[in-house]
Amino acid sequence: MADDLVDGLTRAGLPGAKATARYVHTSPTKARRVVDLVRGRSASEALDILRFAPQAASTDVYKVVASAVANAENNHNLDPATLWIGAAYVDEGPTLKRIRPRAQGRAYRIRKRTSHITVVVESREPVSTGAGARTTRRAR
């Protein structure tokens, strides 16, 4: 997924920006669980969700989303209010192997996993909830 952003444009042809955190000391499985919460949402809503998410990986994902928003604002002059999470994924980084002493002289191998977190934000028009929005529920 290295071609997510080319010349400031996403795959969909929308202007955007990208941020990556590499070698984060979080398991990719746990980080993916947090990234799935915010994929496809507006950037401000994603930051609010991550701020109050109970998972430990949410702080790392929060920093990457905030960095992507700052990159879009400073490098491409995009309005932060129109930014959405276009692509967000977690790749597996190198695994650090450690030894844990166990009973009777044995030793277990401990795998400390790392991950690379990537977030691409794109600028879209804000969705309006005007008169065309349906607010009543259908009777059963």
Curated annotation (Swiss-Prot):
- Pfam families assigned: Ribosomal_L22
Q: Does the keyword Nucleotide-binding apply?
A: no
UniProt entry keywords in alphabetical sequence: Ribonucleoprotein, Ribosomal protein, RNA-binding, rRNA-binding
Among CDD domains, the record links this protein to: Ribosomal_L22
This protein's GO cellular component annotations are:
cytosolic large ribosomal subunit
Q: Spell out the molecular function terms from Gene Ontology.
A: rRNA binding; structural constituent of ribosome
Q: So which domain of life are we looking at?
A: Bacteria
What family is this protein classified in?
Belongs to the universal ribosomal protein uL22 family.
Name of this chain's protein: Large ribosomal subunit protein uL22
